Amino acid sequence: MKTMFLLALLAFTATSAVAQLYTTCSQGYGQCQQQPQPQPQPQPQMNTCAAFLQQCSQTPHVQTQMWQASGCQLVRQQCCQPLAQISEQARCQAVCSVAQIIMRQQQGQSFGQPQQQVPVEIMRMVLQTLPLMCRVNIPQYCTTTPCSTITPAIYSIPMTATCAGGAC
């Protein structure tokens, strides 16, 4: 329970920082240029969602082994609760993160490598399974927009601002 609270607090803090940066820069307080930092490993709850889909999903091509029902229920709760508490835009990015984690695990890639386009089969499975299992709404544009073009949210690369003239 403490872990869930800490994860929720971390997600809230990250969302607030990104929103504050966006608001400050978009209102014209200086000329801000956003620079991506090196790609971090995905947030723990997205790893949990990937594990949940791979281990507990009823989808045969994803399932590696069935966990005990109680184990799946706990992992489902750890995945779905934070997912339900974020914006739809952030959910779309979270779906992309989960799909990328699954793709990298299947291909044996590490998280420091450049991002590749997620195969259609993996993206379709995540888009069909995760919203149903977590009972959350995923925006329609997530089904047609490539992950590489979706605006970064709390589960993606954090952005820092470099402001010209010391203002921002």
Swiss-Prot record:
Signal peptide: 1-19
Keyword Transport included in the entry's annotation: no
Modification comment: Contains 7 disulfide bonds.
Keyword Disulfide bond: yes
Keywords: Disulfide bond, Seed storage protein, Signal, Storage protein
Other remarks on this protein: Encoded by chromosome 7D.
Family membership noted in the UniProt record: Belongs to the prolamin family.
Role according to the record: Seed storage protein. Not integrated in the gluten polymer through disulfide bonds, unless incorporated by reduction and reoxidation during dough making. Increases dough strength and bread volume, but decreases dough stability when added into a base wheat flour.
PANTHER family (UniProt xref): PROLAMIN PPROL 14P
Protein name: Avenin-like a1
Species: Triticum aestivum (Wheat)
Gene name, Swiss-Prot/TrEMBL: AVNLA
